[in-house]
């Protein structure tokens, strides 16, 4: 198994790398140093899109990569990566009513997809000012997790192996973060 971890110039990327590399080979590449044809050529089995500053339009080649490869290679987006997936499928990314940087929140899971074997509620660390607008959520995406206030914390594509989490599974304060990443790795 070989994963490409697309780095959106974020300090959390290597926490993700550390967790993922305990299960498989991981190559970290910056978001503007790779494109979909190179990903196909290198025969990666899965794609993980890291957190990062800014919004999806500022994430190098990530939007194009998801658009071109979501039917071919499983994808997991974390924080900014989650927002990229939402935007690719037509959801709007908006400013959150409350900015959440370095705070832990209760996450309410629907226990499906990469969250299937977790408790219905768990604590997770959040660092974000943008969110997927629930009112414009794509019909192609399902909500897999939310906060108590209904902020989308997890999504998955209805027909393809594409997942996003707004929270940070790589944070030490996210109780089941390693399990979530493992679920993505082992999911067919």
Task: Name each region found by the language model.
Residues 169-188:
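Acyltransferase
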Residues 17-25:
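Two-component/phosphorelay signaling modules centered on CheY-like receiver
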Residues 26-31:
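Short hydrophobic/Thr-rich beta-strand motif most characteristic of the beta2 strand and flanking loop
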Residues 41-117, 121-123, 181-182:
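Cysteine-nucleophile active-site neighborhood
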Residues 113-160:
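Catalytic beta-strand/loop cores that center a nucleophilic Ser/Cys/Thr
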Residues 13:
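Active-site-adjacent helical/loop segments in soluble small-molecule enzymes
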Residues 34-44, 136:
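Short amphipathic alpha-helix with an adjacent loop that forms part of the alpha/beta core around
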């Amino acid at each position: 198994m070989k994963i490409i971890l697309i780095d959106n110039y974020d300090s959390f990327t290597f926490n993700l790398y550390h967790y993922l590399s305990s299960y498989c080979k991981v190559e970290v590449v910056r978001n503007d140093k790779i494109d979909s044809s190179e990903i196909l050529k290198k025969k990666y089995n899965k794609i993980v899109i890291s957190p990062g500053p800014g919004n999806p339009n500022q994430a190098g080649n990530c939007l194009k990569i998801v658009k071109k490869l979501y039917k071919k290679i499983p994808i997991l987006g974390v924080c900014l990566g989650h927002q990229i997936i939402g935007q690719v499928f037509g959801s709007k990314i908006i400013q959150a009513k409350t900015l959440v940087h370095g705070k832990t929140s209760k996450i309410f899971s629907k226990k499906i997809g990469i969250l299937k074997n977790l408790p219905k509620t768990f604590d997770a660390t959040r660092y974000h000012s943008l969110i997927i607008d629930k009112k414009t959520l794509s019909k192609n995406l399902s909500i897999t997790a939310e906060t108590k206030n209904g902020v989308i914390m997890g999504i998955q594509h209805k027909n393809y192996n594409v997942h996003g989490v707004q929270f940070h599974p790589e944070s030490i304060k996210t109780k089941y973060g390693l399990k979530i990443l493992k679920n993505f790795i082992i999911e067919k």
